[in-house]
């Protein structure tokens, strides 16, 4: 892969709470983006692992760590987004058609994760769960398709 300094492990979590009754899709998306923006600063990103190290490093028992994780990762649905990626599609005889992910499970019962990646202009969605909610991926795709068609 020869990724060099372009490869790393980046972890973080933030929660966005919004009222879906009064807004259309794009208003919700803007509201969610504003809700997580404060946690996207370098200071906030650096502080998140420090909080975890403080809990784990103090010799906390399993129940304390589980309670901390449940609080930090509490959500109805987890949405992960790698953003808009652009790179070569051809790797010798192999052509990259899509990338699906990220596939994330925080380990909570009933957790539903939608991983979003846009590669060379193609939106790719992945539903990850130990107990997948039937139709969630299809509904997500439908909502996104309608929202994007509306903007055109």
Q: What label would you give each PLM region?
A:
Residues 1-152:
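Acyl-thioester-dependent acyl-group transfer interface
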């Amino acid at each position: 892969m020869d990724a060099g300094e372009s490869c790393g492990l980046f972890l973080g979590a933030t929660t966005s709470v919004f009222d879906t009754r009064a807004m259309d899709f794009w208003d919700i998306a803007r509201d969610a983006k504003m809700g997580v923006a404060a946690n996207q600063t370098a200071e906030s990103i650096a502080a998140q692992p420090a909080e975890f190290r403080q809990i784990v490093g103090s010799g906390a028992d399993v129940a304390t760590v589980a309670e901390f994780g449940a609080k930090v990762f509490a959500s109805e649905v987890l949405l992960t987004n790698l953003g808009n990626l652009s790179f070569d599609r051809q790797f010798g005889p192999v052509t990259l058609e899509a990338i699906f992910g990220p596939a994330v499970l925080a380990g909570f019962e009933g957790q539903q994760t939608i991983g979003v990646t846009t590669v060379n202009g193609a939106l790719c969605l992945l539903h990850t769960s130990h107990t997948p909610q039937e139709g969630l991926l299809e509904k997500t795709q439908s909502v996104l398709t309608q929202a994007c068609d509306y903007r055109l």
